[in-house]
Amino acid sequence: MLRRGYKASERRRHLSERLSWHQDQALSSSIYLLREMGPTGFLLREEEPEYMDFRVFLGNPHVCNCSTFPKGGELCKHICWVLLKKFKLPRNHESALQLGLGEREISDLLRGIHRVQTPQPGTNDENEHVEEDGYIKQKEIDSEDICSICQELLLEKKLPVTFCRFGCGNSIHIKCMKILANYQSTSNTSMLKCPLCRKEFAPLKLILEEFKNSSKLVAAAEKERLDKHLGIPCNNCKQFPIEGKCYKCTECIEYHLCQECFDSCCHLSHTFTFREKRNQKWRSLEKRADEVVKYIDTKNEIEEKMSHFQEKQGQVYTPKHIVRSLPLQLITKNSKLLAPGYQCLLCLKAFHLGQHTRLLPCTHKFHRKCIDNWLFHKCNSCPIDGQVIYNPLTWKNSAVNGQAHQSVSNRDIIHLSKQKEPDLFIPGTGLVLKQNRLGILPSIPQCNFDELNTPQSPKDAYENTTIDNLCSIKLDNSNSKKLTYDYKISQHFPRYLQDLPTVSFGKIPSQTLLPPIVHKNIVCPTAMESPCISGKFHTSLSRMTKGCKCNNHNLKKTPATKIREDNKRSTLLPEDFNLIVNWSTAKLSLSKRYSNCMGEITRKCSHLSRQPVSHSVNTKSTELSLIIEGVQL
């Protein structure tokens, strides 16, 4: 039966430009099938720009209650959606071009004779699908399974799914089931009906919980504009990421150019493919003799050839060492991934206890086996947002930036390597040996047993050796240390100790001074020079607590005393030693302290004497100061 306004003789053979645009709108819009009103009546809901319901009836002619259909005299996007999505008609199929269909054509459409029939795997008995919680087990999802509400392929769309727990076990998008629940206006305690088997699907409360948890799977990269090719830099201008059109070399591995660099013809020797958005497949382009770029728009043929092209070229996707370096996570009994709604978006199955998940840089998580197989054999990017995992240019830069602190020069590399040598722990008195320039006397720094603030320049390089986390021995790399350590330390240090009183004393309070040596200068002549050893004692303000910090404070002196000391310091020779002894709380007798110090100094000298000899340095132009820090033994 013909409806008014339609003539049977009007048959279309070719796809018009306007109808093609409406088909593009239908395929790119978010439209949901809420209800089927007979075999040819459908209630649709469009998500954007606002949720609106539309009724579509197939017949002769087709009818839709939208505002576009009666005005244009052309099929609207809602009718196109039913023909292309619901009934899977090809865009150029004759039945998809007509303003209406006869009874025979509708009958063929309902029977699906235009589809390629594939054998369906046999279903097992329902009792074999019942799990411990009383639910039906979820059916395996294959490449042809679709969501009955949005009519999208499940494995291709990669959205979280739920399944019918009391009927057929088929999977449907969680988002689509929530839209259907809103249309049915059911209460939270009610059960939803399966749109496929018409049996109870699942409690609405469970669907809402799954929807809440699945929304947490959305990463920030998914919200980026599609014209941003995430993870892909331009190999010429280093723009990262490339925006707009992105060109990929068909012969070089992971070589990309932005629009500006491609127009500058900086890589003319090879051919390129291109894409405008990261969710699109790479399309071929050719250059004619007049150097005008010609785009090939045969989309279906190109998409088929692209996979064969990649296999033919033998392109390596993600290297194994890159994939194995991605973080792994073991699912434990307290993991949030066990909650309803969390699932691997590649296989669309829930996570289970004891499984391993792999985390991508974009924060998406998948089963380890699923994502490894994807990166090894299918694509070098995240299957959800398209962010490229590995690019030789960005990976090389990241590796260089990670070791940037070790570069600059060979001298700096050697200097840093010496500072990072393993710590040597020696119990006993800490020594600080440092080199001073000619004419400059060493000062008494404020000692911090955790870290000594000393200048670090390549010219004054030194080695750090930590002793019991108390202080550091700073050694200059010169020949003088090899010649003077054994003699000067063994000669000056014991003589100084021999001049001290040998009477035993008990525990010295931390705020008690040693008066016999406070204002006394002890001169110890040697065979080489006559060094002046100035003994200064200070009040210890700390008790070796958490930070193990000891602050040295100079005693107050009269102006006359300072002048005399300054005059004596001005006459010091470069080989002189400035020996400063700081005692802290101790509980041993002086004789025991002396023997302990001698034993530790002997071991230190034997260790220091084995230090490698560097380039020759004039010993007369240097001054070595010895600072002895008293520690609690």
Curated annotation (Swiss-Prot):
The keyword Metal-binding applies. One of its GO terms (molecular function) is zinc ion binding. It comes from the Eukaryota. A zinc finger (RING-type) spans 147-198, 344-388. GO terms for biological process: apoptotic process; positive regulation of extrinsic apoptotic signaling pathway via death domain receptors; protein polyubiquitination. Its EC number is 2.3.2.27. Zn(2+) 2 binds at C249, C252, H267, H270. It catalyses: S-ubiquitinyl-[E2 ubiquitin-conjugating enzyme]-L-cysteine + [acceptor protein]-L-lysine = [E2 ubiquitin-conjugating enzyme]-L-cysteine + N(6)-ubiquitinyl-[acceptor protein]-L-lysine. Polyubiquitinated. Polyubiquitination is followed by degradation via the proteasome. The keyword Zinc applies. Keywords: Apoptosis, Metal-binding, Repeat, Transferase, Ubl conjugation, Ubl conjugation pathway, Zinc, Zinc-finger. A zinc finger (ZZ-type) spans 229-280. Dimer. Interacts with UBE2D1. E3 ubiquitin-protein ligase involved in the regulation of Fas-, DR3- and DR4-mediated apoptosis. Functions in conjunction with the UBE2D1, UBE2D3 and UBE2E1 E2 ubiquitin-conjugating enzymes. This is E3 ubiquitin-protein ligase ZSWIM2. It comes from Homo sapiens. The gene is ZSWIM2.
